[in-house]
Amino acid sequence: MNLAAIAKNYSMHNGESGAIVPYVPPPYNFASAPTFSQRTSQMESVSLGILNQAMSSTTGASGALKDEKAAFGAMAERLRDPEPIRQIKKQVGIRTLKNLKMELATMRRKKSALKITILISGCVTLATSMVGGLSIVDNEIFEDYKKNDWLMKAIHGLNLLCTTVLLAAGKISDKIQEEISRTKRDIAKRESYVSAASMSWNGDTEVLLQGIKYGDS
């Protein structure tokens, strides 16, 4: 038997083993149920959408709309956080909510007291200004003022004092109002996170949005 016959016989018995590049069959991909990574990817996609809504411009927005955007941000944060961190933030948020609501009630009482102070100071300032104005247009009142110099000084001093109190109380009231708005936004954010952290999600957005608590709702 010559060399060519031997080579042909060897190739027939060994099949593809004599090929320069061995043949490898393609892998078969079987359909499988959604994995945890797929679910995480879905949650991240929803989180990005919510975060995009929360990061939109707030120029000219009212306080309620700003609170809503803060709630959107809390929802996006909830979807990004893993389960252990989510539960920790939930428990801390529940405790913080109690303190925030107490602070909010205290600030509202302070603002009410300042409103009363502003009202009284405004009335006294207006009255003393009217008395001072009458002394200019009425000679008899002006003569009485000249006879009772201490009364004129007392009226002017009271007018100056009430005007100062009026301006100071107004500035303090504005600062307290800013703190109230910020505290209400923090409460809305934490309530939204706690409400969302108490829910489970199976991939259905409608189920995710049911029962979410926002603000005082």
Curated annotation (Swiss-Prot):
InterPro entries: Orbi_NS3 (IPR002565). Coiled coil: none annotated. It comes from the Viruses. It holds the Pfam family Orbi_NS3. Belongs to the orbivirus NS3 family. May play a role in the release of virions from infected cells. This is Non-structural protein NS3. The lineage of its organism: Viruses, Riboviria, Orthornavirae, Duplornaviricota, Resentoviricetes. The gene is Segment-10.
